[in-house]
Amino acid sequence: MSTAASDSGVEKLVEENKREEVKKNEEEKEFDLGLEENPDSVKKPRKRLAKFDEERLISENGIPKLRKMMRKVKLKGKGHEAKDLKQLLGMYHIWTHELYPRATFDDSISYLKTLGKHRSVKVRRRGWINEIAVENGSDSNASLFTGPSSNSLVNLTSGDPYVQDTADDAFVAQDNDTQLE
């Protein structure tokens, strides 16, 4: 008899536990905030941030876009220097923001200063200067050397993907940026 009484006591406890679980489940359904993770949900990969490197500077949104923007700028000249400077700085501000939106204008300028020292950028810059000189009909080699001596040409080895032949090596001159710093 004692086993029958203990079996019925166990059954009662099991039934009570089941009822309590059902009540808890019903209460949880009523107060479901949707905070529990769903195994079916997939995390969205983070958007890759653009790097501010020489590839980006040389790309279509880099210096070529700046050259196109410069053609649209109309400077008034003598007597309007402040307005012209404001217009140029505004254009540069827009260009740097489009090139790398996460950086401030001051940060962008410091990045550009650093990137301008890379060999591939120097070679491209010299090519663009020569293109402009040909368009204007002037000699671009006169502006090649800005230092006190004309022996500041850098001896470079080819191996850069931007250098088409060894004649491009002559386009690269040393920067005299130490005066500015």
From Swiss-Prot:
Residue span of region Disordered: 1-47
Basic and acidic residues composition bias: residue spans: 9-27
GO BP field: DNA damage response; DNA replication checkpoint signaling; gene conversion at mating-type locus; mating-type locus imprinting; replication fork arrest; replication fork arrest at mating type locus; replication fork processing
Cell cycle is among the record's keywords: yes
Pfam families associated with the record: Swi3
InterPro entries named among the record's database cross-references: Csm3, TIPIN/Csm3/Swi3
Location in or out of the cell: Nucleus
Keywords: Cell cycle, DNA damage, DNA replication inhibitor, Nucleus
Binding partners and assembly: Fork protection complex (FPC) consisting of swi1 and swi3 interacts with mat1 cis-acting sequences and mat1-proximal polar-terminator of replication (RTS1).
GO CC list: chromatin; mitochondrion; nucleus; replication fork protection complex
Molecular-function GO terms, alphabetical: DNA binding; double-stranded DNA binding; Y-form DNA binding
Chain intervals with Acidic residues compositional bias: 28-39
Organism the protein comes from: Schizosaccharomyces pombe (strain 972 / ATCC 24843) (Fission yeast)
Functional description taken from the UniProt entry: Forms a fork protection complex (FPC) with swi1. FPC coordinates leading and lagging strand synthesis and moves with the replication fork. It is required for programmed fork-pausing which is necessary for mating-type switching. FPC stabilizes replication forks in a configuration that is recognized by replication checkpoint sensors. It is involved in termination at the mat1-proximal polar-terminator of replication (RTS1) and also required for activation of the Rad53-like checkpoint kinase cds1.
Chief location of this protein within or outside the cell: nucleus
Similarity comment: Belongs to the CSM3 family.
Keyword Zinc: no
Record protein name field: Swi1-interacting protein swi3
